[in-house]
A protein has these predicted regions:
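Active-site environment of divalent metal-dependent phosphoester hydrolases
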Residues: 10-13, 51-53, 81-91, 111-113, ...
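Conserved beta-sheet core of the metallophosphoesterase superfamily
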Residues: 180, 185-255
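Conserved catalytic scaffold of divalent metal-dependent phosphoesterases
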Residues: 93-197
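Active-site neighborhood of divalent metal-dependent phosphoester/pyrophosphate hydrolases
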Residues: 40-58, 77-89, 171, 177-195
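Metal-dependent catalytic neighborhoods of phosphoester/phosphodiester hydrolases
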Residues: 16, 49-68, 82-101, 107, ...
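N-terminal active-site segment of His-dependent metallophosphoesterases
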Residues: 1-68, 75, 365-368, 372, ...
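Active-site neighborhood of phospho(di)ester-bond hydrolases with catalytic His/Asp-centered motifs
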Residues: 6-7, 43-48, 77-84, 104-109, ...
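Accessory, non-catalytic peripheral segments of nucleic-acid enzymes
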Residues: 37, 42, 251-382
Length: 382
């Protein structure tokens, strides 16, 4: 059996007020080519199909067109689950009708995980789609107040699946979670705080393959058969070194054989350029990829006049500027001792913070409001 595993499309994503729909469409066109070439036995999309719970019209049309071509024209079975960015009920609209075309969209968790059974020349393979489920929602679903962490949720689901799974059949688990040790990036929405979102990879040991979603870097998660495919595109500058693409998985009669990461090429890459502004602008004349999304890390010692405007003259899709010298100076200034900070008035500290973030001072009315709030909080704490 041949499987293509992908995840974290985040259709409709907007980056610094720039729509990425055309970039996402370009990546999906490449994915279509890979599917047409390989004609896999299944396509897995492991959550975060959309970037928002209420997706844009353009994002919905993009997904619809993809499903029509792959599930309709190519007749390749699709198995899709919701992630933490998705609205399960919205994603699974018309899912009962789509199942007739072997397009399986599982947006809402249920007490019993129903397998999707596909076959190859060696027999049946059981696919277990597990949409994202928070501990709070799981406590309600299972009527169990002792479910406190994501580990508790997944352990409950996996245990039940293993109990019911035919022992002589191959199995694939599809899930959207964070496995301990995975490499994270800035663009992944935190599932919870305090480490309660962490899952141990050893609970997946009895499956032949685990198709993971959530982390944006393609990587193994504790075992070779437990993998993140990574996101469709780079969605933050913390991902500039990622090699985006899809994961192709091969099974034989005994189960998992291999996985292969197949890169996809974006129309506009995401890069960081570093140097003084003058150096960056001079080097830009030789740059053949000036349409890329750019963050400039400037090493200038002196202040600059309209650096973003000047940068955009050469890099029209420049998104960020980071002043490295200023950052280093700020880091030195933050060494003020905790004792010294305690001596300062909280209202004045907030005023300094506000001016730093908003580049303007608090007006008289705002000063009074902050002072009133601080006084109330101080009275409560005393």
């Amino acid at each position: 059996m041949r499987i293509i595993h992908t995840a974290d499309w985040h259709l409709g994503r907007i980056l610094h007020n720039v729509s990425l729909l055309e970039d996402q469409q370009h990546m999906l066109e490449q994915l279509k080519v890979e599917i047409e070439r390989d004609l896999p036995d299944a396509l897995i999309i492991a959550g975060d199909i959309y970037d928002k719970a209420i997706p844009s019209e353009g994002a919905v049309r993009l997904l619809e067109g993809f499903i029509n071509h792959v599930g309709g024209n190519l007749a390749v079975p699709i198995i899709m689950i919701s992630g933490n960015h998705d609205s399960g009920p919205r994603l699974s609209f018309a899912s009962t009708l789509l199942e007739k075309a072997k397009v399986h969209i599982i947006g809402k968790a249920s007490v019993e995980v129903q397998p999707i059974i596909l076959s190859d020349e060696h027999g049946e393979v059981y696919f277990y789609p597990v949409p994202y489920l928070s501990p709070i929602a799981a406590r309600s679903l299972y009527q169990d107040s002792e479910i406190l962490t994501h580990q508790d949720v997944i352990q409950r689901q996996v245990t039940r699946i293993i109990e019911q799974h035919p022992k002589d059949k191959r199995s694939v688990l599809i899930i959207h979670e964070f496995v301990i040790g995975g490499e994270i990036s800035d663009s992944e929405r935190q599932l919870s705080v305090g480490g309660t979102s962490h899952i141990e990879a050893n609970i997946f040991s009895q499956f032949d393959y685990v198709a993971m979603g959530h982390l944006h870097q393609a990587q193994r998660a504790g075992y070779d058969h437990v993998r993140y495919s990574g996101s469709l595109l780079k969605y933050s500058f913390s991902e500039v070194k990622h090699n985006k693409g899809i994961t192709k998985v091969t099974f034989d009669e005994n189960g998992f054989v291999s996985s292969l990461h197949t890169p996809l090429k974006p129309t506009r890459d995401m890069r960081i350029v570093k140097g003084t502004l003058t150096e960056i602008l001079e080097q830009a004349h030789l740059d053949t990829q000036r349409e890329d999304f750019i963050r400039a890390e400037l090493e200038d010692k002196e202040g600059l006049h309209e650096p973003m405007r000047r940068l955009k003259e050469m890099y029209p899709n420049a998104l960020e500027i980071k002043h490295l010298r200023k950052t280093n100076q700020n880091a030195a200034q933050t060494e003020t001792s905790f004792q010294e900070l305690q001596k300062q008035d909280i209202s004045e500290l907030f005023a300094e913070f506000y001016q730093h973030i908003c580049a303007e001072k608090l007006n008289e009315e705002q000063h009074k409001l902050v002072a009133d709030v601080v006084e109330q909080l101080t009275n409560v704490s005393n």
